[in-house]
Amino acid sequence: MNNLFFLLGVAAVVVMLFTFDVSFVELWQHLCHAGYWLIPIVGVWILIYGMNALSWQTIIRSKCKEAKVSFWRIYRLTITGYALNYATPVGGLGGEPYRIMELSKDIGNQRATSSVILYAMMHFFAHFWYWFSSIFIYLALAAVGDLPINTAIGTLLGIVIVFCLIAFYIFSKGYRHGLVTKVIRWLGHVPGLRKWSARFQENHAEALHNIDEQIAALYAEDKRAFYRSLLLEYLSRVVQSSEVMFMLLLFGIDCGGGFSGLLITFLHSFLIVSFTTLFANLIGFLPMQLGVQEGGFVLSIAALGLSAALGIFVSIICRVREIIWILIGILLMKIDKK
């Protein structure tokens, strides 16, 4: 099974290399333009994945205090899991089965399943808080005249607020009562899956109940771990904004320079990442979100009054960074040290 995931990752890299929207000559020109800035652009993800791993480790230790899973192992599974998420046909989901399979060797299948589900929930929960907070950042920048505001933009922001509030309600129900059993039951309404759903619930009723209990227990019994994990995931999104800021600075876009100029540039980067990730996650079923991320960057950067060419450059460099980290992830898959 490990080799299957490895081959999937390799195939994904090949596909990504041949699905760039520019020729290899143009790609090389973009890379040359990025120059030494590629080092912090790629390197900042060492910190981002480290924060993700700490968030997941917090959940694992809360669920299984006697478990002796090293931070390096969690860090490795974090990077590899995200590499597979980029690569799989069901974008954003492929890494979870691999994480469960590997972590089961350390803490057992049920605890591994609940911890991976809890971390995936936390990952998306933090996304919604990131999108929610970006609305108020946009409004603050609009209030000082830095960004436009009109009826269309106000309506769009209102829709996002409602979307996030609905998500907060769903997550609160999931964290209080568990959601695995409900998801399996809901799948029974999908044509062709009714018999499978009923059979799965019947054969695994006790395991599903135990996993849901473990999910609900995190918030009910260890709120400190819950909020620490959430904060780490949220802050990792904030740090991710620096990746785009590096590229804006590369083009000399610093909003006048100085502390205030750099702060506004960072907030612009925050909004660019927020819109792009929202756009990509809404259409997350595409493998490697091909074309979606690129479109998100171009639209979000253009909305801030910057050139579409800059949006294309940012999307290409981010795609290169993804390929580099997918390669790192699939290589780490071959490292079995715990």
Can you say where each PLM-predicted feature lies in the sequence?
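Alpha-helical transmembrane segments and their lipid-water interface positions
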Residues: N52, W56, T88-L93, H123-S134, ...
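Re-entrant/interfacial helical elements at transmembrane boundaries that shape
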Residues: G92-S104, S133, F285-A303
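Membrane-interface alpha-helices at helix entry/exit sites of multi-pass transporters
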Residues: F71-R73, D106-M121, S307-I317
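Extended non-transmembrane interhelical loops and adjacent amphipathic helices
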Residues: Y75-D106, E202-D212
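Hydrophobic alpha-helical transmembrane segments in multi-pass integral membrane proteins
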Residues: Q201, G284-P287, F297-I317
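Predominantly cytoplasmic-facing regulatory/coupling regions of multi-pass membrane proteins
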Residues: M1-I79, P148-A280, I312-V314, R321-K338
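Transmembrane alpha-helix interface/packing and boundary motifs in multi-pass membrane proteins
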Residues: A83-V90, L271-E294
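Transmembrane alpha-helix termini and helix-breaking/packing motifs in multi-pass membrane transporters
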Residues: W131-G145, A303
